[in-house]
């Protein structure tokens, strides 16, 4: 008799799941032990190798398992323990797994094999060049939100759909699937305006200024923003320096009802939760692909109840979009997807050749925002102009003013001080205002020769700010004083690095020594 082919691991799990007798109550139950292990957002379980459950179920390390307590259940990655950390009758849980099940130390929980995930087949098909239809995209996103995917599965999804591997229908399907994956806000107002920047340009923190001007004019602008993925600060990170941003949906509605606008963290309101999960992995992989970018942006806008959207699209040698051709391609795609999901949308292509403002990092960017809103003499002119340009475009898109009158209207509100008053009122409504501060340590970087500033590498100056500790340390980052075209002499100040620890300052300075072309002076 010939040898039978050995089934692969996935097939074995399927056979085990379908053919195995239903376990008795005692077979698959273990006593919970809280281990205090931080695995970020990934559910992880720990069981001894000689546990009766491991032996009876045939569990292997990194197996995906379902853990149940009453009506609650989670999916976790299983780690096998070969020590006395746990007893044979115990199961250890990571912090996120423990809190998700709402249990206590010593509770009994059940552990079983995870049923096969059909949606993984769609990802495999995509890897081999197939197209994923709307049904497949819905199943993928549903499994993402339910926590059925491990970090490995999430990484494979992001990689399979990265670059230009998504066609228009796939992007629309992903956007719609992400919209229905979470809550949606419905407003009393028929028109709700919004703004987004595709990112990649450090210091481009126009949002709080735009929200303040628009809200002061009486329009509704509930701005849900993201945290940084690959940059020194996201809008939510920067706003959080000055006011709470992790608000419930009920609280968001209350703030907007009172003030007409808000600037909050999108995931705090459970808008497009699939996007929040994917962003965590994209940040680790340093990937931000075209189709997923569009789906991420537009799904949250629709979920937030927006009807009119202006998109800031910076173009430059060291930002996400390197050419006008690339910007126009993304512009067309975004407008097509926006139309498919019911958004009135306008893309504004802007200059991305250098950082905006002075600060790079949450607290330092917050200082720039306040300087513009307060109409201070030394406020960054480029941040002010960008904010007014985009606000004007939004006012015209909404039909609030005639074509060509948007900038002028926005400038009057800003200059009058009404925008700053509105900003402070929004901060108070969100939970209270806090003045931004500098980090503990600082180090000045000077020009080593005279000349004209010819170029600034946005990615590298951002890297300096991140090595300094931003955005995790909100007060850390860079203050930048050498814009394009500026004549500098040897010894002139180019930028200042701010850190909370001496170690982070050391790493930032080591990077500056290695990368001599962060600022090119000729």
Predicted regions and their residues:
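A glycine-rich helix N-cap at a beta->alpha junction
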Residues: 238-262, 332-338
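Phosphate/diphosphate-binding glycine-rich loops and adjacent basic-rich segments that engage nucleotide
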Residues: 259-308
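Active-site-proximal beta-alpha loop/turn segments in soluble metabolic enzymes
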Residues: 158-162, 195-197, 235-238, 273-283, ...
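Long, compositionally biased stretches
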Residues: 5, 11-128
